[in-house]
């Protein structure tokens, strides 16, 4: 992570700003978070902004700092960009005349993000299963943006796809491109039918009762935000392979993801 404008950067890892310098006019590494904030008109943070509700997300815990520390360093007239910003942080920042822009509030970013997420989820499935996706029976839990993107790409790989959702509109849309659609409450009854299960729902529908019915050769790819939608302790006890795959866009399509964030940030800066 770099907190920067076009002049200063605070790197979360040594030499982490070298690649940034290729794309902006001047980049100077700041010796501290305070120094970076003082000399920056805009502060750019990651998506998610925080994973535990207390600290800004960083790759290395050595460089951890709290969101409250950052909040107290922001000054009136600055802009802060991040994804999934807690409402309390937004409120306090606004009271201090700091403009806050949340990636999650943009209409287009979640759509682009879902594409990278879907491709990453499928990559994880290919990497961790000895079976082809081709002609395999796959379950996708949820049919929001990420669920839709996963289903669309699985069908492109000739997989047999069933969608589980309790939303009537989602169920109707799923029936257009998926092979079958079921209510989420029926997941336990059908869990043993699938070789791959992709979860996008941020609630624990894949509980111990459901896991007992999952085939031992199946693979569960869970992309739901923490703590995820799987009872991981039960999965381990039962010998079920379940992976909690977060940050897939940054892992599998960092350049594309960064480009979309850059466009979002620039659009807000030009308007302000």
Model-derived regions, located:
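Rossmann-fold NAD(P)-binding glycine/threonine-rich loop
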Residues: 84-101, 223-270
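Conserved small/polar residues in nucleotide/adenosyl-binding loops
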Residues: 1-6
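Rossmann-like adenosine-cofactor binding region
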Residues: 50-52, 65-74, 174-250
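Aromatic pocket-lining residues of Rossmann-like dinucleotide-binding sites
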Residues: 153-154
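NAD(P)-binding Rossmann-fold cofactor-contacting core
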Residues: 7-23, 157-177
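Hydrophobic/small residue at the entry helix of a nucleotide-binding pocket
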Residues: 146
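Short acidic-hydrophobic, aromatic-tinged amphipathic segments that line or gate anion-handling sites
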Residues: 25-34, 180-186
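Glycine/serine-rich phosphate-binding loop and adjoining beta1-alpha1 elements at the start
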Residues: 45-135, 245, 264
């Amino acid at each position: 992570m770099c907190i920067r404008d076009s002049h200063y950067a605070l790197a979360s890892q040594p030499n982490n700003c070298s690649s940034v310098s290729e794309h902006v006019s001047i980049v100077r590494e700041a010796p501290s978070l305070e120094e970076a904030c003082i000399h920056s008109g805009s502060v750019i943070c990651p998506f998610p902004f925080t994973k535990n509700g207390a600290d800004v997300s960083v790759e290395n815990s050595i460089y951890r700092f709290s969101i409250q520390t950052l909040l107290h360093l922001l000054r009136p007239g600055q802009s802060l960009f991040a994804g999934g910003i807690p409402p309390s942080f937004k409120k306090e920042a606004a009271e201090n005349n700091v403009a806050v822009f949340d990636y999650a509030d943009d209409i287009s970013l979640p759509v682009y993000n879902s594409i990278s997420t879907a491709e990453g989820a499928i990559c994880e499935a290919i990497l961790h299963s000895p079976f082809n996706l081709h002609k395999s029976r796959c379950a996708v839990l949820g049919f929001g943006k990420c669920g839709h993107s996963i289903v669309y790409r699985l069908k492109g790989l000739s997989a047999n796809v069933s969608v589980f959702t309790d939303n009537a509109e989602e169920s109707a849309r799923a029936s257009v491109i998926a092979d079958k659609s079921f209510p989420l409450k029926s997941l336990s009854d059908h869990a043993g039918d699938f070789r791959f299960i992709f979860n996008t729902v941020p609630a624990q529908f894949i509980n111990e009762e459901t896991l007992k019915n999952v085939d031992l050769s199946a693979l569960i790819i869970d992309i739901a935000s923490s703590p995820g939608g799987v009872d991981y302790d039960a999965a381990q006890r039962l010998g079920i392979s379940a992976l909690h795959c977060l940050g897939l866009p940054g892992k599998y399509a960092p350049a594309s993801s960064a480009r979309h964030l850059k466009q979002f940030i620039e659009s807000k800066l030009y308007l302000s």
